[in-house]
Amino acid sequence: MAEPDRAAPVVVAEAKEVEPTSVPRVLLTNDDGIESPGLRLLAERLHGSYELVVAAPVRDMSGSGTGIGRFDNSKGIELRRASWNGIVAYTVDGPPGLAVMAAALGAFGPKPALVVSGVNAGVNTGHSVIHSGTVGAVLTARTFGSHGLAVSLAYSDPWQWESAVASATKAASWILGHRGRPMVLNVNVPGLPVSEILGTRWADLDEFGYFRVAMADHVEQLLQFEISNRPTGGQVEVGGSEAGRNPSTDTALCHAGYVTMTALTAVEPAGRPEVPPDAVIPMPAGGATLRSV
């Protein structure tokens, strides 16, 4: 993956800088589960270049966002060691956000400098990334002061895993060369052979994403959704519109054949709403009121 054409601001919350080491420590996770070929292939490529630990869900946890699941002090969460030809790997009975939190708190050794999530089978573009376990894992990493890299691959038959792995390894090296505050990058790779990829572009988040979701029906005890991700007439339907409408978005650029990079932020304060200094927000009956100070 070539260096991006232009710089884009990376806005991050206050956190300590990640200290560079001679051999950076990297955590690899995903939301497709420990058996995903994208996870295994990326682990094999990263192993040897970094102090790598793999910790991934025991089953598919797609759509888990930044969730960590439900747990309490009286019960432990199952963690099993896997044998991966010299690669340290664990299965976690929970979503990827939980694996990242555990790593940040020392479950697998020192906190990683970088958390890589992927390679996801299917793109993660647009504002719908908030629901993605792949992206949620790296947003969780950022809240703990680590760099985060989410890598997703567009569908093709056969899957072009090599293209995604090649892009991921270059992006990981690029991020770890960053000496500022931790950053989060969301990378989407087109389902093309490496030789056919047009290049790398910084991209804006699309309004929706590659998938179009609609409410098909609902009754008293059932919600039925309709999900579509098939290109139509050479364009991708995105929330009822064409991806080509805004060519600078991650959905459109990836569909056109580019590897896309989008900088994301973790949760941070948004600042006080713009209200008059004497504005009062009414609280529930019997309570107090909130007044600007």
Where are these regions (language model features)?
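A cross-family phosphate/adenosyl-ligand binding-site feature
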Residues: P9-T29, S36-G106, P110-K111
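Short beta-strand segments
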Residues: T29, A55-P57, S117-N120, A150-S152, ...
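Short glycine-rich anion-binding loops that position phosphate/pyrophosphate groups of nucleotides
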Residues: D32, D60, P95-P96, N120-V123, ...
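Alpha-helix C-terminal capping segments
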Residues: A103-G109, G136-H147
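Short, Asp-centered acidic motifs that coordinate Mg2+ and/or phosphate
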Residues: L114
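Glycine/threonine-rich flexible loop motifs
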Residues: V123-S132
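Glycine-rich phosphate/pyrophosphate-binding loops
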Residues: R142-A164
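Electrostatically charged, flexible surface regions
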Residues: S163-V293
